[in-house]
Design a protein with these regions (language model features):
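A conserved beta-strand element that flanks and buttresses the S-adenosyl-L-methionine
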Residues: 133
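Conserved acidic residues
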Residues: 130
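Short catalytic micro-motifs in class I SAM-dependent methyltransferases
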Residues: 136, 140
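Class I (Rossmann-like) S-adenosyl-L-methionine-dependent methyltransferase catalytic domain
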Residues: 1-125, 141-221
Length: 221
């Protein structure tokens, strides 16, 4: 891990611990984005390109079309890719600074960006999306919030809609990095989405982070 990334992660840890202690465990998202001052190198998960595994999955499933929702959209690359692929996209994040940053990066975007909370989403979003994308969001939440938040996801799907989740997998290897993120187990994920039909679950590692197990999971309503 390079020194800059290590410093960014250390700052993230300080912010998240302070937020947890203050009883506002998700406050650090806005603090991290605001403190970055539009420098994406200060956001450890900002790839500045669409998630390759999402791109691969969507390309392999041309029958999945229509309205898409990106949960915790970050700097917007996944949402923009989906819009370019023909989806009618809504993308939200808890951080207002993050959403303003998206709007500045993509001023003529077709994506509908909004500041929203997974725990308190607009009623109009229920039963409204053909594809819901969750990448690295559940794993960034402390367990007590995650258990509540994950239950909010399946009702977003229309009948026949697909859920695509990508994140860090807790398997046999003990994570060496401090949390967040908190890697998730396949058992936990499948238990939380047991009211959906499991379509696919596979794990992988990236060449640049061989010590981190990751997963792609898809479910259908």
């Amino acid at each position: 891990v390079d020194e800059h990334l290590a410093a960014v992660r250390a700052r993230l840890l300080v912010l998240s611990e302070a937020a947890e202690a203050a009883g506002e465990p998700l406050r650090w998202f806005e603090e991290l984005y605001a403190g970055a001052a539009r420098d994406s190198d200060e956001i450890p998960w900002a790839r500045m390109e669409a998630m390759p595994e999402m791109v691969e999955w969507v390309a392999a499933h041309p029958e999945v079309t229509g309205r898409a929702l990106v949960i915790g959209c970050g700097l917007g690359d996944d949402a923009e890719w989906l819009a370019a692929a023909g989806f009618d996209v809504v993308a939200f994040d808890l951080s207002e600074t993050c959403i303003r940053w998206c709007e500045e990066r993509f001023p003529s975007s077709a994506v509908k960006y909004s500041v929203d909370d997974l725990l308190e989403m607009p009623p109009a979003w229920m039963n409204a999306f053909d594809l819901v994308v969750e990448i690295h969001i559940l794993q960034a939440m402390p367990e007590e919030i995650r258990d509540v938040a994950v239950a909010r996801i399946p009702p977003l799907l229309v009948e026949g809609g697909h859920l695509l989740c990508i994140g860090r997998l807790l398997g046999d290897r003990i994570p060496t990095e401090p949390s967040p993120p908190w890697p998730l187990t396949r058992t936990w994920l499948e238990g939380r989405f047991s009211n959906l039909d499991s379509v696919l679950f596979w794990n992988f590692v990236r060449d640049d982070t061989p010590g981190i197990d990751r997963y792609v999971g898809t479910w259908k309503r």
